[in-house]
Curated annotation (Swiss-Prot):
PANTHER family: ANTITERMINATION NUSB DOMAIN-CONTAINING PROTEIN, N UTILIZATION SUBSTANCE PROTEIN B-RELATED. The keyword NAD does not apply. This is Transcription antitermination protein NusB. CDD domains: Terminator_NusB. GO terms for cellular component: cytosol. GO terms for biological process: DNA-templated transcription termination; transcription antitermination. It holds the Pfam family NusB. Keywords: RNA-binding, Transcription, Transcription antitermination, Transcription regulation. It comes from the Bacteria. HAMAP family: NusB. One of its GO terms (molecular function) is RNA binding. Belongs to the NusB family.
Length: 156
């Protein structure tokens, strides 16, 4: 019987969301420190206790680092895009931290990673949102990513 594997880029996306969440929560702008903390967690599979025995977890380190660095480099533009997609009755300061982290990473990949098709980015982050956010937030993520994909051409 072969062992199960989850796509390395999918794990990198989850790890990037966790890194950006940590950045926001701890108000820590030391990108290298944040990346090292998250990478050490994933490199020590013993840290992940609720996995099926035959499931192997590894991440694309290059994709993870590219996502985190791109978010740090473009954070003001990403937040402006996110805030512009909020309805008038929503205060950006009250957006849940995990939702903002997921949107920062997903929008960053959508706009600054031209090798990944927009449909893949939208599907991947909607799946991640499904595991991390409530139903309303999942719909919001899907809607925002879909709108951005239609509004923006890829930046190179």
């Amino acid at each position: 019987m072969s062992s199960n594997k989850i796509n390395k880029k999918s794990i990198a996306r989850i790890a990037a969301v966790q890194a950006i969440y940590q950045n926001i929560l701890q108000n820590n702008d030391d990108m290298d420190d944040i990346m090292q903390n998250v990478l050490s967690f994933y490199q020590n599979n013993n840290s992940i206790t609720d996995l099926p025995e035959n499931l192997k977890i590894s991440l694309s380190i290059s994709h993870f680092k590219m996502l985190v660095k791109s978010v740090f480099e473009n954070i003001n533009k990403l937040d402006e895009i996110i805030d512009n997609h909020l309805t008038n009755d929503k205060d950006p300061a009250h957006m849940p931290i995990l939702l903002r982290a997921l949107l920062r990473v997903s929008i960053c990949e959508l706009l600054f990673c031209p090798t990944t098709p927009a449909k893949v980015v939208i599907n991947e982050y909607t799946d991640i949102a499904n595991d991390m956010l409530n139903e309303h937030e999942i719909g919001f993520v899907n809607s925002v990513l879909d709108k951005i994909a239609k509004e923006h051409t890829r930046l190179i």
